[in-house]
Design a protein with these regions (language model features):
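The feature marks the mature, well-folded catalytic cores of soluble enzymes
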Residues: 1-251
Length: 251
């Protein structure tokens, strides 16, 4: 039996950066709080836990004072920073720069679309940490779309600025875009300035799909290892499964 490990497998650069930041702090203090799982990988979370990393949730945060807390790569809403300031919590911010850029884009887009009585649409997974952070930038005043069925919430007569969670499938994002265009065309609304689709997908993630398809096609069986809670992992596994039906998900 010949086994090949995909040379591109592993954590994304944002997660690697967060882990490195945690490790550096743990070398100094042997204890650090982390707001949510640093990565959707039980083995890695266990390893860091043994080094002194303690995972807390957002409800816990308000009960901590005068300490250090790591912000993971997913990013956070403004409310998290407000609590930290009020409780004298020092934040070690490992928010992914791609996510931070998207947060800024959504804030600016919200200002612009509000001037023309438009609406913000975010394509993403409900309850996902990144999505919570994105919606928090505009106090939740957006339409969250997880599937084509969710588009019924939209007012297609009004301008639309659309953004995507960074780890979603490019193919699925394109399908959402095309469906919105179709419905607007049916209403005879074709002004391109009133439907702005922002390319906010992470290049590292979106670039993995074609690589994985090639990798999957040249092997008899694919064993895909990922955390069950990883949106990125689920999306990439589906790419493998579509290319090679003998693909199996293990967490």
């Amino acid at each position: 039996m010949e086994i090949e490990i995909d040379k591109y497998s592993g954590f994304c650069f944002g997660v690697v950066y967060a882990i490195q930041m945690a490790e550096e702090e743990l070398k100094e203090s042997n204890f650090l709080l982390c707001l949510g799982d640093i990565v959707h990988n039980n083995k890695e979370v266990e390893r860091l836990n043994n080094l002194g990393l303690k995972v807390i949730n957002h409800d816990d945060l308000k009960d901590y004072h005068d300490c250090k807390v790591l912000i993971r790569a997913h990013g956070e809403p403004p409310s998290t920073y407000k609590i930290a300031m009020e409780n004298n919590i020092q934040l070690l911010d490992a928010s992914c720069p791609v996510v931070l850029k998207l947060q800024h884009q959504i804030k600016e887009g919200y200002k612009n679309v509000s001037e023309i009585d438009g609406q913000i649409v975010v394509y993403g997974k409900k309850g996902h940490a990144e999505v919570i952070g994105l919606l928090g930038q505009i106090e939740g005043d957006a339409v969250l779309v997880s599937s084509i069925e969710d588009l019924d919430q939209l007012d297609f007569n009004r301008p639309i600025y659309m953004y995507s969670q960074t780890t979603k499938s490019p193919k699925d994002y394109l399908e959402i875009k095309r469906e919105i265009e179709k419905r607007r065309t049916n209403l005879d609304i074709n002004d391109p300035l009133q439907f702005v689709v922002n390319d906010t997908l992470c290049r590292q993630v979106s670039g993995r799909e074609p690589q994985l398809k090639q990798f999957s096609a040249k092997h008899d069986v694919i064993i895909f290892v990922s955390g069950k809670k990883s949106s990125n992992g689920k999306m990439l596994y589906e790419s493998c499964k579509n290319e090679n039906h003998n693909s199996y998900f293990i967490s």
